[in-house]
Swiss-Prot record:
SUPFAM superfamilies: S-adenosyl-L-methionine-dependent methyltransferases (SSF53335)
MF annotations from Gene Ontology: carboxyl- or carbamoyltransferase activity; S-adenosyl-L-methionine binding
Name listed for the protein in its UniProt record: Carboxy-S-adenosyl-L-methionine synthase
Catalytic activity, as annotated: prephenate + S-adenosyl-L-methionine = carboxy-S-adenosyl-L-methionine + 3-phenylpyruvate + H2O
Family (UniProt): Belongs to the class I-like SAM-binding methyltransferase superfamily. Cx-SAM synthase family.
GO terms under biological process: tRNA wobble uridine modification
Job of this protein: Catalyzes the conversion of S-adenosyl-L-methionine (SAM) to carboxy-S-adenosyl-L-methionine (Cx-SAM).
EC numbers for this chain: 2.1.3.-
Subunit relationships: Homodimer.
Keyword line: S-adenosyl-L-methionine, Transferase
Enzyme class: transferase
Species annotation: Geobacter sp. (strain M21)
Record Pfam families: Methyltransf_25
Protein residues bound to S-adenosyl-L-methionine: Y40, G65, C66, S67, D90, N91, D119, I120, N134, R201
Amino acid sequence: MTRKTDDIFAAPLQEMIDFKFDERVVAVFPDMIQRSVPGYGMIISNIGILAAKYAQPGSHCYDLGCSLGAATLSMRQRISQRDCDIIAVDNSPAMIERGRELLARDSQPTVPVTLICADIQSVVIENASVVVLNFTLQFIPPEQRLALIKRIHAGLRPGGILILSEKIAFSEPARQHFHVEMHHDFKRANGYSDLEISQKRSALENVMIPETVACHKERLQEAGFSSSELWFQCFNFASMVAFK
């Protein structure tokens, strides 16, 4: 199937509204994410590899903020432990509907997947061995993030992991400037205009709030995780794994 091109912010907008994962975004999301997030494909692939190593027999694996199910599919194709299932959650009905269609095309559905349209903050997390927050926590209000991470930790089995991917910020202005500029250059190289970059940045300003890696690591420790490891970074995008 031909991938639809993201042109949502290509024309000047009369009024800037906050970014949301509606039908327009869902229609172009695969193109948008690949052209906007450096290393996205590598992150998705390695989520499957991490899940294959840390999934435990008879446990749940959660994909919280699953969007179209890329991380879910990566885990599903890699997990071989007995009696594992995946619970994929997103609060966008359009994402869940389209994700269901894409997952149905998987030719080797060896691991059961349950798709749930809900706020991830209201979902019960229990008997988990792997939990994924792939560019999801950044959309949760900062004052609510610790409570969510604590609930994830409480719902994980001993030896379980949380995979946390985020757009990150830097406390030093020079580093922040460098990484933001390089990210913009990455997007330009992938065909986005300066207008598109500027308008999308404005739309995301109030709904996506990045934090430093140090802030994430401190929160993970406060939530009870024994350790965490930064395993991927490209410009201002990173992925960590936290161990219970």
